[in-house]
Every structure is written in structure tokens, then in C-alpha cells.
Amino acid sequence: MSRYDSHLKCSFCGKSQEQVRKLIAGPGVYICDECVDLCNEILDEELFDGNANPAPPPGSPKPATAATTSHQGPRKPKRSLTLSQIPKPHDIKRYLDHHVIGQNEAKKMLSVAVYNHYKRLAYQQSAEEAGETIEIQKSNILLIGPTGCGKTLLAQTLAKLLDVPFAVADATTLTEAGYVGEDVENILLRLLQVADLDIEEAQRGIIYIDEIDKIARKSENPSITRDVSGEGVQQALLKMLEGTIANVPPQGGRKHPYQDCIQIDTRNILFICGGAFVGLEKLVDRRLGKKSIGFVHPEESKTKEQRAAAILRHMEPEDLVQFGLIPEFIGRMPVTAVLDPLDETALTEILTEPRDALVKQYQKLMHMDSVELEFRQDAIEAIAREAFRRKTGARALRGIVEEIMLEVMYELPSRQDVTHCTITREMVEKRSSADVLLLPSSLPTPESA
């Protein structure tokens, strides 16, 4: 096509070549750069339109709407929830007991709260059909406990039992809208991705927000400076916790005015927030007028952490306000559970008793190399003792076992003469070599000896 042919026009808008920046020729047709830009805008709009389901560009998430599925094949039918399908509080706690050691009071509170939450969902479905107008508000949960005591594990286990989508978010990465960091809506995007971009399924899931104490207000006077990662985040979370139609950017990141967003109703999403709240026990102790921490106490056999947990059981909402949470945020967390710190006995049980206990995991790994792994009881107690000294709860257990098992897991897969390996207390305390049992054919004969 000659660029000097002035009679050439765009086949779509009718503009001549002189009126546009570029005219592209096809077989018998022409299109200008303005129409190309318009077509791109239309395609971008339809990418997340419920009436269209085109293939997304490489590297981007698949479109998700209430009317389409994000995976190949027919859409899963919407699951109806009846009261008989919801596990009772006793059943929930029994299931938690198989996976989480201790924390009986917290398990009871969680079992009742989760049972009531999903009973509320079942009621909503039946109420819509019966035309009832009573609306039952949801009860989000606040977990308070030291690091490594099982806050996240409790939430994960609940989601596994209920077979609902579960997402974990870190509150420390969140900032107020307009500032560097993540918007609070990105929490919902994680839940949506776990649900395979099925909005209906995501809207009945569970979100666990960890390190919630890190968004406490930095100053008692909110007017001194703008607290974009503290009070600002709390304000941004309020509507989401209570229940709202949130606009979620489908590819994450910041929202902008010309972006199509996915709408998610958070009214039926259960939010569980957890944090260590270091120093909160001092505020409670001061309010009670007692000096239990650091002085001779009637329960002097307890550790400092155990005494702190006992004081936290007398916590009131005003203590959380003084810690830095705003009253509106606390009001949307009506269920508060305090978790106990793990002592040596609990750490010993964690190593062996749960279904997926750490000792069982390493025994399974070594069994795949045809080696039977045995942990002596005194070795298990020594591991628990060392983990207790590290003051990081159950998280320390895996690190210690990894240190102990490093040489074993490095050497034994290459040896065909070992059938049994024993971990002893000396190996834990001195990092000495493990006791191994050789095959009879590999044992030295008296003559060779």
C-alpha cells in the first residue's frame, strides 16, 4: 500500500489516511491505529465479563465470575448446606484433638464458633426459601497466643475438616489504599485462587490473618501522624470483616479506576485473626492492679509465659484498645480465644501423637529408603527440651530434627547394608552419629575380623 494514496480509508471508522497516524492494510480492508486501540479496550473488558470466556493472556490468572468456571469441564454444582451436614462442636473438637496438642479451651471456643457460623449459612439458605427475615450476624475469631503455639494450625485443621477454601494472609504486608504495599482486597484474591477462582465457593471459605497485632496503632493519639500500616489497615479491614461487596483486582496489586474487578461478598467468609500480642499481659495486669509478672506468685512453679497466659484470660476489650486496636475493629471480633504456651510435655506429645507428627513424617521418609527409623523416648524428650529453650514453640522442633537427621539422610540413601537406624539422647545432645543396624550379609565374619 502506498502511503501517498489519499483515497484509502479505514474500513471501520471511515477516516482517511491523513486523519490517522497509521493505516494497516489487509486483504481488501484497512484498519487505523485508533480502531486497533478501541478493539484492545473491548477485548480487555470482555476478558472478565460474565458473558464471555476468552483465553487469558499468558501469565495472567484465569477470569473468574459468578457465571463461569476457571477450570476445564463443567462447573461444579453449588453445594447446599444442611444442618445435618455440619459437624457438631464435640465432633469438631475431637477432630482438632487428633491434629493439635493441648489448647483445650481454645478448641472448645473455636468448635462452637465455627459450628454456629456454618449453622448460620445453613439457616440463610433455608430462610431464603421460607421467606424468613431474621438475619444472624457472623462472629469472627481473634486468637491470642505466643509464637509456635498452634494458631495457624488450628485454622488450617478447621478448614480441612469443613472442606472449605482456606487462605492465610500476613497483616504486616498490608497498607492503607494509596500507599506502597498490599491492599486488603488482595487477601480475598488469595482465597479466590485457593477456590480455583470459584466465587461461590470462596464466599463460604475461611481466611486466617496472621500477625494481626502488628497493625496496632503506633500512637495513642491518632492525629500525630498518618499510620498507613497500623490504624489505616484496621480501618480498611472493617467493612470486609463485617460483610461487604469487595472489588478484588483479578491480577492482584493496586486497583485503578479503569480496571475491571471481581466482586466478592464477604458476609459469609469467616475471618480468624491471630497474633502474639507481646506486652498485652502487662496492660491487663496493670488494670487488675496486680504485680504477678516478675514477682513471687502463688503458682511459682509456672513459667513466665504460663503466668502471662493466665493473666490474659482476664483480658477485656479496653486492654486491646490500649494495646493499639481501634474499638470498631475489636467489635468485629466478638470471639476471643487465648492459647497457652507449649511446655516440654506438650512439645514431647507434638513429636509423636498427632496423625502427622514430626517423628512419623521422618519415619515415612526413611521407610522409602528401606530403613526403619526409631526415636528413643529419651531422645524425644531431649528434642523437646531443646525446643523449649529456644522459646519459639513447636516451630523449633523441625529445625532441631533436621539438624539431627542431616547426616543420616545424607548417608543412608546410598547404603544398601543398613536396615535400622536409632536416634538416641546422646545424638540429640552431642550431635553424635546414629546407631545403625547392618544386614546380616554385611556383618564382618570372625575370620575377617
From Swiss-Prot:
Q: Quick one: which residues bind Zn(2+)? A: 10, 13, 32, 35
Task: State if Cell inner membrane is listed as a keyword.
Answer: no
What's one GO-annotated cellular component?
Answer: HslUV protease complex
Q: Quick one: which residues bind ATP?
A: 146-153
Task of the protein: ATP-dependent specificity component of the Clp protease. It directs the protease to specific substrates. Can perform chaperone functions in the absence of ClpP.
Fill in the subunit field for this protein.
Answer: Component of the ClpX-ClpP complex. Forms a hexameric ring that, in the presence of ATP, binds to fourteen ClpP subunits assembled into a disk-like structure with a central cavity, resembling the structure of eukaryotic proteasomes.
Q: What is this protein called?
A: ATP-dependent Clp protease ATP-binding subunit ClpX
Specify the species: Synechococcus elongatus (strain ATCC 33912 / PCC 7942 / FACHB-805)
